[in-house]
Design a protein with these regions (language model features):
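Extended, highly charged
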Residues: 1-283, 287-578
Length: 578
């Protein structure tokens, strides 16, 4: 594995996965614009190394933004190699050890596992070559990105935020964006469900300042580990040690009693004072593709800034998918499937989180279906498990369905009995979900397709020779009538508060429509299928916006919702775009 971020950059360049940008490019908008275009190119394009940023540090972006680079960052040729290794490891570790010989055979496994645990070492690390303390600190030295026009300022977008539980001493490494407020303070955007926020609450109860250390760079496996859905109280650097097959070497921060990887590129040390009033942070063009709007978060005070002699500043750009984070999510699919089978649902055969679902809005699972109601069991279990609790729409198929095939899923969706297969619930949603009227809580919907015959006959959809506006709708699109029985509708330009899709279909003579989804034409009229799916998943709360009509048509209101209208969210953000 890699001894530094520069080591990884050398490997990227050797494999033709890196483009150097020698021209001067500003961290304010320009780096993000170039990176966004590259990330949306075929296969994720290339990693980008901006060598002239107007600061003393180069910036690398899109460094894990393809299947090949994501695998390379984790030290394998293909992500399935890690999944296979985890499956074999768990199988060996959990096999009952009845005899003495069985126990002796397990000793090599125990010896290997012991080599993954992080090691604390004395002295300073490479990350502490250059040191600025207290008044010497100037965060404006760092090429933090301002990505989108309405962003509240410049942000650290790949921070590994180290906190320690004041009661147990257990370390956590999370990834929470940080808005630069001035030379020595930032915001700390940890959501209420995150471990950092739980630690903050514990320090507040104890009446103590909370030490926080943020690192950037180093072996790219650290960055991945900080994003991974690890169980509470399990060290992210244990996962990193497993992935890189050797321990992470940790040194003590200079002004905080927290240990950090010695080979990182930057270290930002400081504290959060829970007795202080929270401050306004945001807006920020987020991974959902929308702005997350201004809200109150803690202020982070910086006491020291250190960096390597040859430091490279890592950054990511998030926005309308696909972006780099889609490939990070794909790695998580592969790596955590075996633990999901073990700890949550052994009948789960495969898991897919389509890029359009931005990790939380949409997931597809296949299961080994053996009894009635099993899909209900799986849905409720997944909605209560780790970060899957944020999932909003879930599709469940039988084990033989290739869930990444649009054709296979379309055949099931076209033929399923919607009156029988819908599983409705409500629960925790991502704080960034803007469609629900209550922040962090809303509707959930699963479709049980496990008993649907993909070869069953289907009735034709009857379309009108011409249609007229009705129910607040004026246009329709039939591109997916054949494969899905889906009619795409566009609301009137006046953006009425309510639309009546059932009235539009009835008055214009549509018959046999399985699904009808309405969008704002200005927002969605020229969108590709993937973007329409992204918009529909993001803009809807299943409780309010998904209705099964009396004649069996599933209608979905995917328009932007007008704040203040009964049942709508109090604020509705814009799409993050240049």
């Amino acid at each position: 594995m890699y001894r530094s971020l520069r080591d990884y950059i050398v490997e990227l360049e050797r494999r033709g996965e890196l483009l150097r940008v020698a021209a001067k490019v500003s961290p304010r908008f320009e780096i993000a614009e170039i990176t966004d275009r590259m990330a949306k190119s075929e296969g994720g394009g290339k990693a980008l190394l901006f060598e002239n940023t107007g600061t003393e540090f180069p910036v690398i972006t899109n460094m894990m933004g393809s299947d090949s680079r994501m695998a390379l960052a984790l030290g394998v040729e293909r992500l399935d190699d890690i999944a296979d290794r985890i499956t074999a490891l768990l199988g060996e570790a959990l096999t009952p050890k009845g005899s003495l010989m069985d126990k002796l055979r397990a000793l090599p496994l125990l010896a290997e596992m012991s080599r993954w645990f992080p090691q604390q070492v004395s002295g300073r690390g490479a990350c502490q070559h250059t040191v600025y303390r207290d008044a010497e600190v100037d965060l404006c030295r760092l090429p933090m990105l301002q990505s989108w026009e309405c962003d509240g300022g410049a942000f650290v977008t790949l921070p590994m935020v180290h906190t320690v539980d004041p009661d147990t001493g257990v370390r956590n490494v999370g990834m929470y964006r940080m808005q630069r407020f001035d030379a020595r303070t930032t915001g700390m955007h940890w959501h209420i469900h995150k471990t950092g926020a739980r630690h903050y609450d514990a320090y507040k109860r104890a009446g103590r300042r909370m030490p926080v250390v943020v690192t950037l760079g180093g072996d790219p496996v650290y960055t991945y580990a900080a994003t991974a859905p690890m169980p509470d109280n399990m060290d992210e650097y244990l996962l990193a040690g497993f992935l890189r097959r050797r321990p992470v070497r940790l040194v003590k921060a200079l002004t905080c009693d927290i240990y950090i990887p010695e080979d990182c590129d930057f270290v930002i040390e400081g504290y959060v004072d829970p007795s202080e009033e929270k401050v306004i942070e945001g807006d920020f063009g987020d991974h959902t593709g929308f702005y997350s709007l201004k809200d109150l978060y803690p202020r982070f005070h910086v006491t020291a800034l250190t960096h390597r002699r040859d430091a490279v500043y890592p950054a990511t750009v998030v926005g309308v998918p696909p972006e780099e984070d889609a490939y990070i999510a794909k790695a998580t699919e592969k790596i955590f499937l075996a633990p999901i089978r073990l700890a949550v649902q052994p009948e789960v055969e495969d898991l897919w989180m389509p890029t359009a679902g931005t990790a939380h809005n949409l997931a597809v699972v296949s299961i080994d279906k053996r009894y009635r109601g099993q899909a209900h069991k799986v849905a409720q279990a997944l909605w209560g498990a780790g970060q899957m609790m944020f999932n909003k729409y879930l599709v469940i198929t039988s084990a033989e369905t290739p869930i990444r095939s649009f054709g296979a899923l379309a055949a099931l969706l076209r033929r399923c009995d919607l009156r029988q297969c819908m599983i409705r619930s409500e629960g925790i949603l991502d704080v960034l979900d803007h469609a629900t009227a209550t922040c962090g809580f809303g509707g959930k919907l699963a479709l049980d397709l496990t008993d649907t015959d993909p070869t069953a006959a289907v009735a034709d959809v009857t379309l009108p020779s011409e249609a007229h506006p009705a129910g607040g709708i004026e246009l329709y699109d039939t591109r997916h009538v054949g494969d899905l029985g889906l009619v795409i509708l566009y609301a009137e330009a006046s953006r009425p508060d309510k639309v009546d899709m059932e009235a539009y279909l009835r008055e214009n003579g549509f018959r046999g429509v399985r699904y009808a989804v309405v969008f704002d034409y200005q927002a969605a009229g020229t969108m590709r299928d993937e973007d329409l799916l992204w918009l529909a998943a993001a803009n809807t709360d299943p409780r309010r916006d998904v209705v099964l009509t009396a004649d069996g048509t599933l209608t979905v209101d995917a328009r932007s919702k007008r704040p203040g209208v009964e049942g709508n969210p109090p604020r509705f953000p814009n799409v993050a775009m240049s």
